[in-house]
Amino acid sequence: MVFSSVSFLVFFLPCLFVLYFIVPHRYRGARNFILLAFSLAFYACGGPKFLLLMLLSIVINYCCGLLAGPKHRPTVRKAGVTLAAVLGLGLLGWFKYAGFFGEMLHALMPFIPVPQVTLPIGISFFTFQGLSYVIDVFRDDAAVQKSPLKLALYISFFPQLVAGPIVRYTTVAEEIDERHESVSEFSAGAVRFLFGLAKKMLLANAVAQVADAAFSAASPSVLFAWLGAVSYTFQIYFDFSAYSDMAIGLGRMFGFHFLENFNYPYVSRSITEFWRRWHISLSTWFRDYVYIPLGGNRCSRARNILNLFIVWFLTGLWHGASWNFICWGLWFFVLLIGEKFVWGKALSRLPALLQHFYTMLLVVFSWVLFRADTLGAALTYFAAMFGSSGVFCGERVIYYALEFWPELLCCCVAALPVKTLLETALEERDSRISRAVLIAGPKLASLALLTLSYCKLVTGSFNPFIYFRF
């Protein structure tokens, strides 16, 4: 079940709203239980056989969290956090990487069979959430959660369960115990959810057709290859940020406030800035739980480079068990090292437009690695972008450019902080009309977007979120 499906919008969500809000606010435990039950049902709809795996992950992190608490001796606390890391990452490693490493072993020793393992939905996300809780307890950054049901709600809460953002326990710990739902909060959450739904249905799914056509073409022309790469650059942003918007909006409807996961990354003027704005919950997770414990940048240059290499190798591997993702992570490692130690100062002296062009060109290249099925396919596509087909234009690029130019233009505008600039301008005017627009404008716009999105939903084909496979 996905947020942009009829079953979720027409059946799951309305039933949850009715059961949740019919319970009086003072019965917080009952409301939490309803959220937990629906979250488990939500996950079971996508992979019922893996529901036990997620429950096992919850039990592991609950027990290890108790061991890592301050009441125990240091050796017991270390054992608790170590056990959580070994078991949690062990399960993640088996289900996500057994096939990948098995294929490499099979190539060297054909008598070793390749494990046939199905990847559970959202395992990368709920594993990282559970592990961060135990580590925070061990560091005394979070209190031990003694209620297994409350910890289960934190790990399995359906808005961010299968595709993020990765929510820290400290972000929602107080709201699990005591939160204040209101009409204004519910309304703001609904508007955020509907804007995310529109991103997915009206923009991401549209440009996905261009990207799919270009990447599946046997020998695309130069312009078609570039159009496909740019289209996928828009697709992955509007697809993933749409899910984050919808998750943040849903959480807010129930009184939870998740941190932002994107901050207009395509306005960045460097790769360093890009990663401060893109998938913020993942980059900060690796910063706090891998990079800083390794020594961060408070060490020699050689050690700092090694720390960054480890982080970006793991970042690539986290996204998937393939050489494409590993090379994708190492691509950003090279660029970040270059900006930090080689050409960063020279880059900062360039005009802003050139800085932006440099950043987006390198980001587009990175998404080719991300989108291609194999490393060989990525290299072939790069060759097509620089003329290997011998055709510069071709009929297909003309067709797709004419067919999808409105969506591509909307993507260009929506990738900019236009909404923020408009809100700032209206707030500065501080007139009766501007205040009315600030209050009613987003609500009216979200209703219009809901109508358009629903039309696409009932007439279009199923197109799952990209990050579901991670």
Residue ranges and their predicted role:
Residues M1-R469:
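Membrane-embedded transmembrane alpha-helical bundles that form the catalytic cores
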